[in-house]
Amino acid sequence: MNTFVLQLDEETIQHLIQTLKEYQVQNANPYIRFAAKFKQATILIYASRKVVFQGKNASAVAQELGYKPVVHKSNQDNIKNKQDCSLIGSDEVGNGSYFGGLAVVASFVKQADHAFLKELGVDDSKNLTDVKIKQIAPLLEAKLPHKALLLSPQKYNEVVGDNKLHNAVSVKVALHNQAIFLLLQEGWQPDKIVIDAFTSPKNYQKYLKNENNRFSNPLTLEERAEGKYLAVAVSSIIARKLFLDNLDELSQKVGFNLPSGAGQQSDKIASQILKTYGELGLETTAKLHFKNTKKAYQLLKKE
């Protein structure tokens, strides 16, 4: 199967979504904001504005839509030659999912850990199944120094939104900074600190000024870092398990199978929760500022 990857600006992505709207398909991956099947190719648009074309006709479809694709290199190729020092890597999971909390993890990885990680098959958690994530995450947690933070939906809704302490970006800055700070406080001394970029360095520094717990170590924000640095991949895997466990726990509490992601299935489940519990049900299970909340109310009115 051929795979091609593009990094597009928001305006171009909106145009592509409009073009492929009638070919849209459901996708449960919380990192994917739009998915479509078009002429024997699958097109995936990630929240990071990465666009992936997959399938036998991936190249032809990409070119037909006006894009010049770049062959996607394997994550192992990306990881190679970037692991010659001790690293703290940080990543978050849940920011693209309507239901569930926001998990942020920072992990410390030494060069001596690489053989263990490669034996486990550690890679970008976006390419691992949930079953695999749940198998290897406990092994990583037991062996590697890390700090894991989970902002529950209820707490998220208290601090994120209009006229509140945080917006969707600043809250991630706060969580990443705190996770890394706590790890450094334990005495771990990395040669480099890398965060999987979710905003520009300038924007990160702007929001960082509001944080009390600061550190002087140099910090790098790098796009798709979870596919380039084992330390970030480790954090991505642990954070994914933390998010999934939280989603399972919330599902049991409300009696509905809460999906990850922010698609139509989330709208439907949200409307059922509204019908059963009122808005309080969403306040404790979902991120209210997502558009899904409005859509859920609209679905409820149609009943």
Swiss-Prot record:
InterPro entries: RNase_HII/HIII, RNase_HII/HIII_dom, RNase_HIII, RNase_HIII_N, RNaseH-like_sf, RNaseH_sf, TBP_dom_sf. GO terms for biological process: DNA replication, removal of RNA primer; mismatch repair. Manganese or magnesium. Binds 1 divalent metal ion per monomer in the absence of substrate. May bind a second metal ion after substrate binding. It catalyses: Endonucleolytic cleavage to 5'-phosphomonoester. SUPFAM superfamilies: Ribonuclease H-like. It holds the Pfam family DUF3378. PROSITE patterns: RNASE_H_2. Residues 85-302 form the RNase H type-2 domain. Gene3D superfamilies: Ribonuclease H-like superfamily/Ribonuclease H (3.30.420.10), TATA-Binding Protein (3.30.310.10). Belongs to the RNase HII family. RnhC subfamily. Endonuclease that specifically degrades the RNA of RNA-DNA hybrids. NCBIfam families: rnhC (TIGR00716). This is Ribonuclease HIII. It comes from Streptococcus mutans serotype c (strain ATCC 700610 / UA159). The lineage of its organism: Bacteria, Bacillati, Bacillota, Bacilli, Lactobacillales.
